[in-house]
Regions:
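N-terminal export/assembly segments and adjacent metallocofactor-ligating motifs
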Residues: 1-318, 327, 331-332, 358, ...
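Short, glycine-/Ser/Thr-/acidic-enriched flexible segments
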Residues: 28-31, 40-41, 47-50, 63, ...
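N-terminal leader/propeptide and maturation segments of large enzyme subunits in energy/redox metabolism
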Residues: 80-96, 249-364, 463-473, 477, ...
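Glycine-rich phosphate/diphosphate-binding loops that line cofactor/substrate pockets in enzymes
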Residues: 100-117, 170-178, 342, 365-381, ...
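A glycine-rich phosphate-binding loop feature that marks nucleotide/adenosyl-phosphate handling sites
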Residues: 124, 257-260, 368-369, 385-388, ...
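Extended redox/cofactor-interaction regions of prokaryotic respiratory oxidoreductases
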Residues: 131-209, 235, 317-323, 335, ...
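Glycine/threonine-rich phosphate-binding loop and adjacent beta-strand/alpha-helix elements that clamp
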Residues: 171, 585-614, 625, 630, ...
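Long, contiguous, secondary-structure-rich segments that constitute the structural scaffold
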Residues: 610-612, 616, 622-676, 751-753, ...
Length: 965
């Protein structure tokens, strides 16, 4: 260590500086401090002044240095050499002007003729407000990010039920919880903040129960691990609901006032069957919360106006007959009564046979939940006023918290499973209450939000922005993106009768549909930061073949493929045009309230990235690429009235763009107004970037304490949210115990509803799965599988030290994970004749993989699992030939099918029939030992030649004292 007396001390300190920015090594987006000496990155640590991670940093975050030093960096635009196949990495370097001119000419022609022939799909990019705006201005509906492949079931299932969801838009209040139940969550989800919260929760005496097929990461520190079979969480949740209702351990007051539980549903066979009965003599007032519904007053024994503060006499259960009046003689039932009937048969014994959890443990868990919610309830002395004008002196705390993610979502039954979880939380009265689930801005929003997607071909016109958003939240069949014949308008078939509520699109079906020209042919597919030729796809083998598929004339079936990435991934080798992106330490970027911010429970939080070091070579941020293309193509939002360029570059766009002229709402919420003294709303501030940079690159607006809770119904908060542009209306957001939205689709399927109808071959599918109440069904793949031949479930999860496939080129993180194993319960391995550390075959009906196995008691016997995306194609990411990642690493993707047979009509996406969520946790497999004479190398093997632009970088790195050797 240098002492102040050392002559070198002043030189080192004078040349050392610290800059703050936002991490991008996973989706957590922690605040970081980057230490530089002589302009070179020396060290990265957590920023203790950042509200999200409070100085905590993980292995990924501190290893960002080696992201900069990656041998896989792309540094110049590349064009595939004419006559060479995709996948060969046969490129020639071109200038940015050549790249822009090529794209401008091609995209201008598409936009002027048929905008649908351009498709833009992105990975975990954290900039969907910009990419979505670009797609809408272009005029193409064919846009989405990776959510349909990731966790749309979690987002949609909860948003359609309670108006918010886990992760960016809400989470568990572990500061005040007494019991915490985590389901289906791996280490990558909300990583550092969750670790910080869990450590405090455990130290304060909280009880932590983890329900997961695998005991790793978070589960390892749980007080109790309850192993469960994959895809069966819904059955467990329904059994818990059954027990709580049977024992009358529910929050009656909360359900009557803040949910649609007491609302009366029509039972008669008519066009109103299954819908809430409405008074035709009263106005609806608004479509989100109709003011003309009924409840039943059990004291007076008459139907009464539903929307009132006087709810104590409302019946939660019961079936009634309407008296004289517009609905005389009609049979009605409360929504809660329908839920009670739905779960009546969902006993712990029923769930136990499905989940593998003993009935007694299910009963005990229900009692634990109720005990925490009611016996350990408390009050905070916070006065607030509800939406109906009622004054409350305190906020009630229900200290039982949940968290769940992809383990529930990535199944074809995930939407209804997540609905069941949201309803369980609601029965306990935990929604936006201390110790329970709490929203994060910009949520809560209506159920669903008032964002409607393209729903008609007339909204798509040449040289014209879309007439609606490319992505939205359908509320009726009329909101579907289908043509006059009921056929899909979008390439991925999102918002069609196949997957009506696909709020995040179906990125995983884009390549297959484009090659098969189903529903039509496209011209140009642009992919940003999505490794769809490897791990970010359902079946890697088939997709790699499809990317190279040609027609009878020898032309590629996807005529033009553009890939933007910072690194030489497997996907890059298939591109016709490669656009080299910057790293997160080389660019401006923002985590916007308009997109997926990093808000806290107490108020909106957004953040930025600022350049720490200059870009390498000729790298250019994809954000800049979009701004440049939008300006050249003269999109209305990017040009002045006389057709001139409106924004100089991406930073200028972020500062000056407003959602509507004069709205005062832009991408960043902090330091708005001419003097930078306004928050959330205000005129553009030319010095906004500088103000973020001087304030740790983060803006945290702390709301007054009276706005912290009960925000679905908190009059003060709702007024504030509307004024600040977080919501469109001030109406309360009632919890949808019963989803009338789902019933509208079911009515159409049964022919009871006028208007749009599903194609005949999909009627039964829609009628079955669009149950307005949650129910459990086996994953769809099970119906196409001989389960006795494939008795095991196979799943993946991300390790703490790696994210997607981004980190195998990171010299530090490779030392933690250079290859992966298949983890098998010792009993299962013994029965299959497989030794610990031995080579084995994993087979599904769709494919097979040879890999190494390890026995582990931290996995339930019916499941095998591995780390996601550790395996690599030989040569990709500029790893040396024969690297462990290629020779010993493997993917389970080779075992998964993108499509399933659909009776009598061909094939359909292997996805949730409601949301289109990829069902990549549904695959069934069998295992057997590899023969002794087989090569000890994983199968299948593939080769990805390194691009010419990356081959000059060294493959063996030693980083010390600012040097790279």
């Amino acid at each position: 260590l240098l002492t102040p007396e050392d002559p070198q001390h002043s030189r080192v300190t004078d040349s050392t500086e610290i800059k703050t920015t936002t991490c991008y090594m996973c989706a957590c987006r922690c605040g970081i401090r980057v230490h530089l000496r002589d302009g070179e990155i020396r060290y990265i640590d957590g920023n203790p002044e950042h509200p999200l991670n409070q100085g905590v940093i993980c292995a990924k975050g501190s290893s960002g240095i080696m992201k900069q030093k990656s041998p896989a960096r792309l540094t110049r635009p590349l064009r595939r050499i004419a006559g060479r196949d995709r996948g060969e990495s046969a490129f020639e370097e071109i200038s940015w002007e050549e790249a822009f001119s090529l794209l401008e000419k091609r995209l201008a022609h598409i936009r002027a003729t048929d905008p649908k022939r351009f498709a833009l799909f992105t990975g975990r990019d954290q900039m969907q407000a910009l990419t979505g705006l670009f797609a809408r201005q272009f005029g193409t509906p064919n846009y989405a990010a990776h959510g349909g492949f990731c966790s749309v079931n979690m987002a949609a299932g909860m948003i359609y039920t309670i108006g918010g969801s886990f992760w960016e838009f809400g989470g568990p209040d572990l500061e005040r919880a007494k019991l915490f139940v985590m389901l289906g969550t791996a280490e990558d989800h909300h990583s550092n903040p969750m670790k910080v919260a869990l450590s405090k929760f455990k130290r304060s005496g909280g009880r932590f129960i983890s329900i997961n097929p695998i005991r790793t990461g978070y589960s390892a520190i749980a007080d109790e691990w309850i192993p469960i079979r994959p895809g069966t969480d819904g059955a467990l949740l329904l059994a818990l609901i059954h027990e709580l209702i049977r024992d009358d351990r529910i929050d009656h007051e909360f359900l009557k006032k803040f949910s649609n539980s007491p609302d009366l549903v029509c039972l008669d066979d008519s066009t109103e069957k299954g819908l809430f009965l409405r008074d035709p003599q009263r106005e609806a007032v608004n479509e989100d919360l109709p003011q003309n519904k009924y409840a039943w007053d059990q004291v007076r024994n008459v139907p009464v106006q539903r929307e009132t503060d006087q709810t104590e006499h409302f019946a939660l259960t019961g079936e009634f007959v309407m008296p004289a009046g517009p609905h005389h003689g009609k049979r009605v039932v409360t929504a809660f009564e329908l839920l009670r009937r739905e779960v009546e048969a969902c006993t712990p014994e029923w769930a136990g046979s499905i989940t593998g959890i003993s009935p007694s443990r299910i009963r005990l868990l229900a009692k634990e939940l109720a005990h925490a919610a009611f016996e350990q309830a408390f009050e905070l002395p916070i006065a607030w006023t509800d939406a109906w004008g009622g004054h409350h002196d305190a906020v009630i705390g229900r200290p039982v918290a949940f968290h769940a993610m992809r383990g529930l979502a990535a199944h074809s039954n995930g939407f209804q499973t997540v609905r069941a979880l949201a309803i369980l939380m609601s029965l306990l009265g935990t929604i936006d209450r201390p110790g329970g689930f709490r929203h994060k801005a910009p949520y809560p929003r209506q159920t669903p939000p008032r964002v409607r997607n393209v729903s008609d071909e007339t909204q798509i016109k040449p040289n014209t922005p879309l007439g609606a958003a490319p992505l939205g939240f359908p509320a009726r069949p009329e909101d579907l993106c289908v043509d006059a014949n009921g056929q899909p308008i979008r390439l991925d078939k999102a918002f069609s009768w196949e997957h009506p509520l696909s709020a995040h699109g179906l990125m995983h079906n884009v390549i297959t549909n484009a090659v098969h020209q189903d529903p039509y042919a496209i011209d140009t597919l642009m992919i940003f930061m999505a490794n769809m030729a490897w791990n970010s796809t359902m079946n890697t083998t088939s997709i790699r073949a499809l990317l190279n598929a040609k027609d009878a004339e020898g032309n590629f079936k996807i005529p033009f493929l553009v890939v933007c990435d910072a690194f030489d991934s497997e996907m890059v080798s298939f591109a016709d045009l490669v656009l080299p992106d910057t790293t997160y330490l080389e660019r401006h970027d923002c985590m916007s309230i308009l997109d997926r911010p990093i808000s806290e429970f107490d108020g909106p939080v957004d953040a930025v990235r600022v350049p720490i070091v200059p870009p390498q070579g000729e790298c250019k941020p994809f954000q800049e690429v979009l701004i440049e293309l939008a300006s050249r193509l003269k999109f209305p939002a990017f040009t002045t009235a006389d057709g001139g360029r409106k924004f100089k570059d991406y930073p200028d766009f972020i500062v000056h763009y407003e959602t509507a002229p004069g709205s005062g709402i832009g991408f960043l919420s902090g330091w708005r107004g001419p003097n930078g003294d306004q928050s959330l709303r205000g005129e553009p501030n030319p010095k906004q970037w500088e103000m973020y940079a001087s304030n740790n690159c983060v803006h945290h607006y702390e709301m007054p304490i009276e706005h912290h809770y009960m925000r679905n119904w908190n009059r003060g908060y709702m007024k504030f949210a509307k004024e600040m542009g977080l919501r469109q209306k001030e109406d309360p957001i009632q919890i949808a115990i019963y989803s009338e939205i789902l019933q509208h689709f079911r009515q159409s399927a049964s022919g009871q509803r006028p208007g749009r109808q599903p194609p005949d071959h999909l009627r039964s599918r829609v009628a079955t799965y669009f149950n307005p109440l949650p129910f459990w069904y086996a994953p769809l793949e099970y119906g196409a599988t001989a389960l006795a031949d494939y008795p095991l479930n196979a799943v993946t999860q991300r390790p703490m030290a790696m994210y997607h496939s981004w980190d195998s080129q990171n010299a530090w993180l490779r030392q933690i994970h250079s290859h992966n194993y298949l983890f098998i319960n010792p009993i299962t391995a013994k029965n299959a004749g497989i030794e610990d550390g031995g080579w084995l075959w994993v087979e599904s009906q769709w494919g097979k993989v040879r890999c190494m196995g390890r026995t582990s008691e931290a996995v339930e016997p019916g499941t095998v699992w591995t780390w996601n995306a550790i395996g690599k194609s030989d040569g990709a990411w500029h790893l040396q030939s024969g690297a462990d990642e290629a020779r010993k690493g493997f993917l389970l993707n080779h075992l998964i099918s993108e499509e399933l047979p659909l009776e009598g009509t061909g094939r359909i996406s292997n996805s949730d029939p409601i949301t289109g969520q990829a069902g990549w946790y549904d695959v069934r497999v069998r295992i057997r030992p590899a023969a002794g004479d087989e090569p000890e190398i994983t199968y299948p093997q593939s080769h990805t030649p390194s691009t010419t632009a990356a081959t000059s970088a060294p493959t063996e790195l030693a980083y010390f004292a600012g040097s790279l050797k």
